Every structure is written in structure tokens, then in C-alpha cells.
From Swiss-Prot:
Gene Ontology molecular functions: cyclin-dependent protein serine/threonine kinase regulator activity
Region of interest: Disordered: 575-594, 677-761
Domain Cyclin N-terminal intervals: 300-411
Family: Belongs to the cyclin family. Cyclin AB subfamily.
Keyword Cell division: yes
Position of sequence motif Nuclear localization signal 1: 19-27
Motif (D box 1): 316-319
Stored Pfam families: Cyclin_C (PF02984), Cyclin_N (PF00134), F-box (PF00646)
Gene Ontology BP annotations: cell division; G1/S transition of mitotic cell cycle; negative regulation of centrosome duplication; protein ubiquitination; SCF-dependent proteasomal ubiquitin-dependent protein catabolic process
Free-text domain note: The nuclear localization signals mediate the localization to the nucleus.
Protein name: Cyclin-F
Family matches, as PROSITE patterns: CYCLINS, FBOX
Taxonomic lineage from the root: Eukaryota, Metazoa, Chordata, Craniata, Vertebrata
Sequence ranges of Basic residues compositional bias: 739-749
Length: 761
């Protein structure tokens, strides 16, 4: 075609060059491409050591780390302890508001653990530094009771300078320099004064007790709610005789309870059960008591096994059973035991713990709880001895820091015992019913399936079950239903599951086929009227009385497989005696050898040399003030010993097989071995000789059935009292008691001469 004409689009006359498609380079996305707030969040979730590494990667990361204190405030120091190499890292994080760093630094300086200081003036230097970080800890303590006092509580060292006393004096001086008033400064002063008052109240000196009252008044004026409640407790007895003063006292208590003081809420609930002329006041307070029971939430303990990959129900059962035996032999209260188990469960839900350290976690939690609520403490060195020196002194000190920091200082939490005590004040209970309720409550600690119910429901269910087993005509009266908000219909599934787990299913057995019955042995004591020997109604009969279908499939007791099991825990009876069977006989406490009671310093340990066989020669730490009372040094209190060993026993090695009899004397030689899955080999370098006590079983075992006859309680508006009818019990028959069987408190075979120890101290 001629120029200027239109071209067609055929292939002959139109051949336009194809358009090139330019490939765009893909955008390279890196960590630095994230928004700054997201990048900051990533840095805050890193361990402290990794933050330093990230800081060296890029100038932008260095700028974020240096300019944002929140990175260090939220840095994790899990399984890291202060030392001379990382001291600057810990101090920087503490100054930025890192709670974990403050707790660990305070404990490290107090116990001289990890941070070596010259012996000249060690108590003064360490005490001042520990005081500084304990003060920072209370400043950062949000939502928990003031707790640093449990580390400096008496007894104090009577020889030479005492680090605890230095911390106390330093904190007292700090309170003197801080002006009283509202705000963060006043709240900090109130918390520290509360801690100082708690320390002073534990002395036997009357002058110190009066000084403690003055400290509480000053603390309450600075806004400390816990101090105000303690002052109310001291004045409450005098107010009972005067109706006007009682009314004022009752209103104060109601105010403290409404402001969130847990102890005040419990005291208020108990006061509602007393007969007094303030009926109108009680009715208004009854609504708050109902809220206390209804606000109790279930604690999902089954999530423990999500965090603890190598742990199962049986291993937890064995650990709790061992803690019950320790509490029994040391005469610790039921509240202390429940708090210890709660502390263990909460820590295991947060932090992954190697199997070899489960016993360490348990005994460390008991040390913390005894110091928090008991007058008589479990000393660190005695706790180490209870585990047969499986762990060192410094291991327990560090584990205490890990637990306190992981739980953010929240030690005291509502327990079944708290709600049980309230219920015992609401209606009159006979002695045997109260003991049976306590027995059921402690049995409930052993089973994770029961955690589907809240502590308040478990306490109510335990009381209801106890009254049914004792054939009360109206086991759940209208007064309890109105006060707690739990009706008989709501509690029936909980009661059925409690009875099934506690009385119907068989208890797990250890590797020697011995039933783990520490709770049963605990309640065979005359103190509890031997309530665990009572014959209990069978499960079928209970279901018939409650009108629910009976699932009478008994869960088989979990027994270890002889071809594959790990020795887990030894009884706290020492390594020379067997764990007592049910036919054991109770012995008098006075006939026992007392336990080590002194927390010796390095110098004192060098002077004593090999006289004290505590297997702590490698320990470079110690605190001379951590010892027990004078009465314990004279033999008034005894304690067991136990051991944790996770050596794998294989059938290919017949020399390692358990071939003991009940009369043999047992000796344990712990050897640190790893399982085949952990070290990738089938060989072992030694064998563990025949041992007594607890053992774990295969990881797939479970001591209980997973079936549950009911669902957790859901509060419903309104109470239906038409169903609160008497349960038709048959005529009572004479109870058939089992043969009298008591537990023997074992003597320690190691020779610890208390007379010579006192001379050296």
C-alpha cells in the first residue's frame, strides 16, 4: 500500500515489533523491613543474650535497643543466673525495670551465689546490694502481695555480721528518706514497711512486736491494703465485746474485701456464719461472699503436659505424693501443702522443666511456701538434705529465683483449703466430717482431671461428699446453696468424679508395685481421728443416691513396665530404708535423729571439715543466717530425706534389675544417664543399685481414667431449692475398719551430731 494509506493488520503488511515486558525485581524483604513497632516487639521477646547479638547486626537494631528501655525491661533471663560475666547485662535490665533481673540479683547477693565477693565485709557489701534490688523488685511488683520479706525473715545469724540484718537496716533507712504521700513513692514505702513489719513480727521479742505494729500503721497510712488488714486482725478480738465497735470493724472488713484483699474476703465470708445482731449488714455482705465463690475459676492443669513434653499424669502423681510425705513428716499445714502444689503446677505450666529437676522444683516450692505462711521454715540446706543431696545448695537457691520470677511474685493464690474453711464456718460440722472433708481435699491434689472444677467447687464438692458418706439427712442445706451459689444439682458431677478418683480407682504404684498412698497414711494419724481407715460407700451406691447413671468401669492402676521405666523419686525416708507399706507402725517423733539445721558459711564449713557429711564440698555459696529455731536444733522437729534419679534401667543389663525384697537394706548410687532418645545410644556406663521409694513409669502411662462423668459448673441465675430434699440413706451399719496400719517416720542413717554442731556454731 502507498504511504499515508491505512495498513491492515494482517501478518504480511503489519509486522510491528513486539513490546518488551520488563521484569521487575522482586522486593527483598528482611527483618529490617518490618514496621518499627513490630520489630520492637520481636526484640522484647528475645532472651537477654540474644538482644546483645541482635544489637551488633545492624545500626538500626542498635538504635532500637539503645533508645527503648522496654527491650531490656521485658528481656528474658530464663535459666540464666547472675555471674561476673553477665553482671552488667543483669544490672542494665534491672535499672530498666526488668522484674526477673531484680529478683535474681537480690537473691544472688543475699546468698552470695554466682557473684563472688571477697570475704572481708561480704555481709555488708552484699546486703546493701541485695537491698537495692529488693527495693526495685517491690517497686515493680504489680498485682502480688509484697514478698521480699520471706528472704530476710528470721532466724538471723547469731555469730558475726548477718546479711539479712544488713538488708533489713538498709530498707528501713530507705523508708526514712522517702516522704510519705500518695502515688508510686507512697505505695513503694507502704510495701517496704509492710515487709519490715512482717520480719519484726516473727521475732519473739515484745519490743520488736510493738515496733511491727507501728510499722504496720505507717504502712497502712501510705496506702498498703495488706497492712490495713493485719491491723484489723489485731483489733478484731477487742471489738467483739462492743456492738458499736463490732459494726465499725465489720464495715472496715467489708471495705478491705471490696478493694480486693483476699484474706479480708475470706474473713468476711467466715464472719457471715457467726450469729450476731448485725443481720442487715450480714445480708449485704452475703452478696460479696457469693461473688467470692462464683469468681473462683478452674485451673486447667492438663496444659502442664503441653509444656512438659516428657511428663505425664503418673509422674506428677508421684511428685505430689512425695511432697505430701515430706509435709507429713515436717508437720506442715494443709494450707502449706495446697499452696506448694499450686505453686508447682503454675510453674510447670509456664516453664519447661527437665525430668531430672522435677523434684528440685517441688522442694523449692515448699521452701518458698513455708517461709510465706509458716512460722517454722524449711531451710535451704535441710531441703537439700531431704533430697539425699541429689541437688546442691546453689541449685535450690537458683530454682527459688526462677520460680519467683516466672510467677511474678504471685505466691499466695486461692486454694481449696480457703473455701473449705469458709464452709466450715457457715454451718456446724462435726469433727469427723471436717476431717473427711480435709482428707478428700488433699486427695484431690493428686489428680489433674479434677482441675476441670474450680477450687471453690472442689471444696463444696468435698464437703458434700463427706456429708453424704457420713449419711447426713440434708447434706447440702439451703444456707450453703444461698451463700455459695452452688446447688446440689450443680455439684453432683463434681461429687461423682471426686468419689471415683479418690475412692473407687486404684492408686498408682511405683516400680516395686507399692501403692502410693501418702495422703492416706497422713490421715491415719490420731490428729485426724484415723479418718482414712473408715470404710467408704461404694461408687454404685453413691450414684444411686444421687440419681445419676453409674459408670462402674474402674480405671486400672498404672504400673510400670518392667522393660522400660525410669527411677523417678525416692521416698523421703532416706536411702537406707524402704518406703513404708500400709502395715507400717507409727513411731514417736521424739525418737528420731534431727535433720541438719544450719546454713553454714564457707569459713564455718572449712572449720568443720568432714564432720558434717552433707556432700556439699563443691558448693561455693552459703548463708549462715538460714537456720532453724533453737527447738529444732534440740531435736524437736525431724525430717525425711529423698533422692531423685532418672537413670534408665534396661532389661539388657541384668545387673541393673531390681531384685530386692521388703526386708533388704537398700543403697542408691545415682548415675546421671540419658535415655536413648536423648543421647542416641543404647549403652550405659554403670547401673543403679536396688533403691527404695518412688519411681516413674513409661511415659504413656496414666494413673487415672480420662473419662469424666460430668461437665464443669456454669453459674445460672436463680436457685432452685425444690430439689434440696433429704437423700434416702439405708439404716447405718457398724463401720468395718481396716487393720490398724500406721506409717513409720524413718530415722536418718547419716550421722549428724547436733551437739557438736552447736559447739561449732
Amino acid at each position: 500500500m502507498k504511504g499515508g494509506g491505512l495498513h491492515c493488520r494482517c501478518s504480511k503488511c503489519f509486522a510491528a515489533p513486539p513490546r518488551r515486558r520488563i521484569k521487575r525485581r522482586p522486593r527483598v524483604l528482611t527483618l529490617l523491613s518490618l514496621p518499627e513497632d513490630v520489630l520492637l516487639y520481636v526484640l522484647e521477646c528475645l532472651p537477654a543474650v540474644d538482644i546483645l547479638s541482635m544489637r551488633e547486626v545492624h545500626p538500626h537494631l542498635r538504635s532500637l535497643v539503645d533508645s527503648h528501655s522496654s527491650v531490656w525491661a521485658r528481656a528474658s533471663f530464663q535459666d540464666v543466673w547472675p555471674s561476673s560475666e553477665n553482671l552488667n547485662l543483669f544490672e542494665r535490665a534491672a535499672e530498666c525495670g526488668n522484674f526477673e533481673a531484680c529478683v535474681k540479683l537480690g537473691i544472688a547477693y543475699l546468698y552470695n551465689e554466682g557473684l563472688s565477693v571477697s570475704d572481708d565485709g561480704r555481709a555488708e557489701v552484699n546486703g546493701l546490694k541485695a537491698s537495692r534490688f529488693f527495693s526495685l523488685t517491690e517497686r515493680l511488683n504489680a498485682g502480688a502481695d509484697p514478698f521480699v520479706w520471706l528472704f530476710i525473715r528470721p532466724p538471723w545469724s547469731s555469730s558475726g555480721s548477718c546479711c539479712k540484718a544488713v538488708v533489713f537496716d538498709s530498707l528501713n533507712e530507705e523508708c526514712g528518706t522517702v516522704t510519705s504521700g500518695e502515688g508510686a513513692t507512697g505505695a513503694l514505702k507502704g510495701s517496704i514497711q509492710y515487709c519490715l513489719a512482717k520480719v519484726l513480727s516473727l521475732f519473739e521479742d515484745d519490743d520488736k512486736k510493738r515496733e511491727a505494729l507501728g510499722m504496720l500503721e505507717s504502712s497502712a497510712s501510705n496506702g498498703c491494703l495488706h497492712s490495713a488488714y493485719l491491723l484489723w486482725e489485731t483489733k478484731q478480738k477487742a471489738a467483739l465485746s462492743d456492738p458499736g465497735r463490732y459494726l465499725q470493724s465489720f464495715r472496715q472488713l467489708r471495705d478491705y474485701a471490696a478493694r480486693g484483699c483476699w484474706d479480708a474476703q475470706i474473713s468476711l465470708a467466715k464472719a457471715c456464719g457467726h450469729k450476731n445482731p448485725l443481720n442487715q449488714e450480714q445480708r449485704s455482705a452475703g452478696e460479696l461472699v457469693n461473688q467470692v465463690f462464683q469468681s473462683s475459676l478452674p485451673i486447667n492443669k492438663s496444659s502442664i503436659f503441653t509444656t512438659q513434653k516428657g511428663m505425664n499424669d503418673t509422674m506428677r502423681y508421684i511428685l505430689i505424693d512425695w511432697l505430701v510425705e515430706v509435709a507429713t513428716m515436717k508437720d506442715f499445714s494443709s494450707l502449706c501443702l495446697h499452696m506448694t502444689v499450686g505453686l508447682v503446677d503454675r510453674y510447670l505450666k509456664l516453664r519447661s522443666v527437665p525430668r531430672a529437676k522435677l523434684q528440685l522444683v517441688g522442694i523449692a516450692c515448699m521452701v518458698i511456701c513455708t517461709r510465706f505462711i509458716s512460722k517454722e521454715i524449711l531451710t535451704i540446706r535441710e531441703a537439700v538434705w531431704l533430697t539425699d543431696n541429689t541437688y546442691k545448695y546453689e541449685d535450690l537457691v537458683r530454682m527459688m529465683g526462677e520460680i519467683i520470677s516466672a510467677l511474678e511474685g504471685k505466691i499466695r493464690m486461692p486454694t481449696v483449703v480457703d473455701y473449705k474453711d469458709v464452709l466450715s464456718h457457715l454451718i456446724p460440722l462435726d469433727r469427723n466430717t471436717l476431717h473427711l472433708c480435709s482428707y478428700i481435699s488433699e486427695l484431690s491434689l493428686l489428680y489433674t482431671e479434677l482441675s476441670m472444677y474450680s477450687p471453690a467447687q472442689l471444696a463444696a464438692g468435698a464437703l458434700l461428699l463427706a456429708r453424704i458418706l457420713h449419711r447426713q439427712a440434708r447434706p447440702w442445706p439451703a444456707q450453703l446453696a444461698e451463700t455459695t451459689g452452688f446447688t446440689l444439682e450443680h455439684l453432683t458431677p463434681c461429687v461423682v468424679l471426686l468419689h471415683k478418683k479418690c475412692f473407687h480407682d486404684d492408686a498408682p504404684r511405683d516400680y516395686r508395685q507399692v501403692s502410693l498412698t501418702a495422703v492416706k497414711q497422713r490421715f491415719q494419724d490420731d490428729l485426724y481421728d484415723q479418718i482414712s481407715k473408715e470404710k467408704v460407700m461404694d461408687h454404685t451406691h453413691l450414684c444411686e443416691l444421687l440419681g445419676v447413671p453409674c459408670h462402674d468401669s474402674e480405671s486400672p492402676a498404672t504400673c510400670p513396665n518392667a522393660a522400660d521405666f525410669h527411677q523417678f523419686l525416692c521416698s523421703p525416708s532416706g536411702n537406707k530404708t524402704k518406703r513404708r507399706r500400709e502395715e507400717s507402725i507409727q513411731e514417736d517423733r521424739g525418737s528420731f535423729v534431727t535433720t541438719p539445721t544450719a546454713e553454714l558459711s564457707n569459713q564455718e564449713e572449712d572449720l568443720l571439715g568432714d564432720f558434717l557429711d552433707w556432700s556439699l564440698e563443691t558448693s561455693c555459696s552459703g548463708y549462715e543466717g538460714d537456720r532453724e529455731s533453737e527447738g529444732e536444733r534440740e531435736g524437736e522437729v525431724t525430717a525425711p530425706s529423698g533422692v531423685l534419679d532418672l537413670s534408665l534401667l534396661l532389661t539388657e543389663h541384668p545387673q541393673c534389675q531390681d531384685s530386692t525384697t521388703d526386708d533388704d537394706s537398700i543403697t542408691l548410687h545415682p548415675i546421671p544417664l540419658l535415655s536413648k532418645a536423648e543421647n542416641g545410644t543404647d549403652s550405659i556406663e554403670g547401673c543403679v543399685e536396688k533403691s527404695s521409694g518412688y519411681s516413674s513409669v513409661s511415659s504413656g502411662g496414666s494413673p487415672t481414667s480420662s473419662s469424666s462423668p460430668g461437665l464443669p459448673f456454669t453459674p445460672t441465675p436463680g436457685l432452685n431449692h425444690s430439689k434440696l430434699t433429704p437423700i434416702p440413706f439405708p439404716q447405718p451399719c457398724s463401720p468395718l475398719l481396716k487393720a490398724s496400719r500406721r506409717q513409720v517416720k524413718r530415722k536418718n542413717q547419716a550421722q549428724h551430731s547436733e551437739d557438736n554442731l552447736s559447739d561449732e556454731l
